């Protein structure tokens, strides 16, 4: 037993002790530590793809036992498995990820029908047991990985070579099934060998051979769609809403920097009132769009708003709940950005997230439809009552706000009051939902 295996793999301590199969210092690292060996990622063009895996450096390098990393995404050196990552165009990433999920689901459902048929025809109890275990964990990402490995091992063991089939029907098969049946099966085996078949021609072996030939599609995939607020709130919003409305089992992460970061600091619908950005040099006049509440209105979408620096435990639990939920999920992550002009420096972004939540600028919450279906209140406000006295100090600690005071001081004061009022209205709305 090693230190890493002393704790449950998917506990907070267990994850911290495991090697990552993604670059370090990111919320995505935590996701890869939990589900990396089964992850498929559709990544929108933007900051999330630039620092998340540029095409010309992306390669399946092996993670070394010493923790050395050679590319943003790597394979686990023990299992040889790792995330499958692809970068789409900016505007169609949600649909791109949906296509991945749909294709995977249809392939697995086809294999599921074959496995259900195999349960009824296999002559081996251990084959039946392994097949049934795979079927029972079909929709469980974590449990199905182990069940798949056992299923594949059983398939490899169960397939009878053609010479073995001939030998069986000449001897033990005759005793077990009778001379008449054995003679018929022996003739079929000889004909199959003459035709060049390497395996027993029985229906069970045919099913096992087909399943084994498609073994890479057996395990439950963890489908993720990554993008920024320019994609999720603006240009790709129509596609994102379509994907959420599809009911497909996908997980969407929106990295919310509240501005078009990669394209040059332009204002987006995620930009709050009072913030200075291109196309809003005198401060944005209208409030930030509440993407989370829009997604929640579907009623069957798991939605969460997180800030890892404010609560690692909430972020960790949200990631696990989102993956476990059988349906679409949306996780909106507050992400301090160089375009914010943070006075304390980009080396302290985790602390900036903590301050944002403490003062009420950002709120932590999650909505789980599964709890609502069970007759409970599925909405949970995860952050404490904000200290509103810190709100003005927080925004003045960022150049995107304090620069407005220098250029348009009168308008700045009015907009800053509106910014705080909007934050309070959001909080009161979330609080009411959590108390229902």
Regions found by a protein language model. Give the residues of each.
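Flexible, low-complexity linker and terminal segments
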Residues: 1, 31, 63-132, 136, ...
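Iron-sulfur-cluster electron-transfer modules
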Residues: 1-185, 198-205
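Conserved thiamine diphosphate
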Residues: 13-18, 80-128, 133-140, 144, ...
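Short, glycine-rich nucleotide/cofactor-binding loops
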Residues: 18-19, 228-233
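General structural feature for long, well-ordered alpha-helical segments within catalytic domains
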Residues: 23-27, 34-37, 43, 103, ...
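Structural signal for hydrophobic packing residues in well-ordered secondary-structure cores
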Residues: 32-39, 55, 108-111, 115, ...
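Glycine-rich ThDP/TPP pyrophosphate-binding loop and its adjacent helix/strand module
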Residues: 192-212, 217-225, 234-251, 255-385
């Amino acid at each position: 037993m090693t230190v890493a295996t002393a704790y449950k793999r998917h506990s907070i301590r267990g994850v911290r002790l495991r090697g990552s199969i993604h670059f370090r210092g990111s919320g995505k690292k935590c996701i890869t530590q939990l589900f990396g060996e089964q992850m498929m990622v559709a990544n929108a063009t933007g900051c999330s793809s630039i620092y998340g895996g540029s095409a010309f450096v992306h390669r399946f390098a092996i993670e070394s036992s010493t923790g050395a990393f050679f590319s943003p995404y790597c394979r686990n050196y023990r299992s040889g498995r790792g995330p499958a990552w692809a970068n789409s165009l900016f505007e169609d990433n949600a649909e791109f990820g949906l296509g991945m999920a749909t294709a995977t689901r249809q392939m697995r459902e086809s294999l599921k029908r074959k496995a259900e048929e195999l349960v009824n025809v296999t002559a081996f109890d251990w084959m039946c047991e392994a097949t049934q275990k795979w079927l029972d964990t079909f929709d469980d990402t974590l449990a199905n990985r182990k069940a798949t490995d056992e299923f594949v091992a059983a398939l490899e063991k169960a397939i009878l070579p053609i010479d073995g089939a001939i030998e069986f029907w000449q001897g033990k098969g005759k005793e077990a099934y009778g001379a008449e049946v054995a003679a018929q099966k022996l003739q079929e085996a000889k004909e199959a060998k003459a035709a060049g078949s390497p395996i027993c021609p029985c229906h069970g072996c045919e099913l096992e051979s087909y399943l084994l030939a498609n073994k890479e599609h057996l395990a439950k995939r963890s489908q993720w769609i990554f993008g920024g607020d320019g994609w999720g709130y603006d240009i790709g919003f129509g596609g994102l809403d379509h994907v959420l409305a599809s009911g497909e089992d996908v997980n969407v992460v929106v990295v919310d920097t509240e501005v078009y970061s990669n394209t040059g600091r332009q204002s987006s619908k995620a930009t709050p009132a009072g913030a200075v950005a291109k196309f809003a040099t005198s401060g944005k006049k209208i409030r930030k769009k509440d993407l989370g509440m829009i997604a929640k209105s579907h009623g069957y979408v798991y939605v969460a708003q997180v800030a890892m620096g404010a609560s690692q435990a909430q972020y960790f639990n949200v990631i696990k709940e989102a993956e476990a939920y059988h349906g679409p999920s949306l996780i909106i992550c507050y992400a301090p950005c160089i375009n914010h002009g943070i006075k304390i420096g980009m080396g302290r972004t985790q602390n900036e997230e903590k301050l944002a939540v403490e003062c009420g600028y950002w709120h932590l919450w999650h909505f789980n439809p599964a709890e609502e279906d069970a007759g409970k209140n599925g909405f949970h406000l995860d952050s404490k009552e904000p200290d509103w006295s810190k709100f003005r100090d927080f925004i003045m600690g960022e150049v995107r706000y304090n620069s407005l005071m220098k250029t348009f001081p009168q308008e700045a004061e009015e907009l800053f009051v509106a910014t705080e009022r909007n934050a309070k209205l959001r909080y009161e709305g979330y609080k009411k939902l959590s108390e229902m």
